[in-house]
Design a protein with these regions (language model features):
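Non-catalytic interaction/Regulatory regions outside core domains
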Residues: 2-139
């Protein structure tokens, strides 16, 4: 009888933990909500990687207008975690992902200098080519 009660208690506790974890992720935003509205630069850095973070911060500050002009949303993950966003399926390493309007990964790099290439990569995309014809540059 004691064994049966122990098993029931273990099953109850384990299902409670799983549902609690599920509730925590339910409130997070899925990056797919940005499909067809934003391009994404998804960055996943190690918490102790201060040099890369500083490099990216300086790049963001220097390129604010260009980032806005190309309709890019920057999403940071630290050690695969983000309080606001769900972890996307492609986030299996540390690095930098450029995600297009269609939600597909267009390019990936482990190196922070990749951020310097994304404007060129975006400007080669067909939708961006149309945007450049239709809209006046802001920067």
């Amino acid at each position: 009888m004691l064994n049966i009660l122990s098993i029931i208690l273990i099953l109850f506790v384990s299902s409670y933990d799983k549902s609690y974890g599920f509730e925590k992720t339910m409130n997070k935003i899925d990056l797919e909500t940005y499909n067809w509205t934003k391009r994404l630069l998804v960055i996943n850095l190690k918490s102790q990687d201060k040099e890369k973070l500083s490099y990216v911060d300086n790049w963001l500050f220097a390129n604010k207008c260009i980032i806005e002009d190309r309709n890019i949303n920057i999403v940071f993950f630290e050690d695969f975690k983000n309080k606001k966003y769900k972890k996307p399926p492609f986030l299996i390493d540390f690095g930098f992902w450029l995600v297009g309007y269609d939600g597909e990964v267009k390019s990936f790099s482990l190196e922070e200098k990749f951020v310097n290439e994304i404007f060129y990569l975006i400007d080669q995309m067909p939708i961006r080519q149309q945007e450049m014809l239709m809209y006046k540059k802001k920067c």
